[in-house]
Amino acid sequence: RSAETFPLMIETSYLLQSRFIALEPDVLREGSLYAYLESRYNMEITDAGEVLSPMLANTKERLLLQIPAHIPCMLCERFCHEREQLIVIHRTVVRGDKFKFKAAYYVDEKTE
């Protein structure tokens, strides 16, 4: 993904092959991976977890992100499950000099 004239992040998704047979990669150029999987394969993510870790990019990642070796990055790994079955691993390398993470947390009020 890019913003203006520079790349921001590298996104890679690993899908459970037996769950997503005959995947059509060209369709992904036009929209969201998750929207495509939901409509084409009736995917329903029931839970997901995410891990954020600081990192330095490897040679290939530095070339794609157009950054020197000393620029820190953030590795975001998301693990998506469908009824306790791991179906998607999403790996994102985000350049640390042009991107901020923002999180918001909400309390779910339980009704009695």
Task: Give residue spans per PLM region.
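C-terminal all-alpha effector/ligand-binding and dimerization domain
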Residues: 1-112
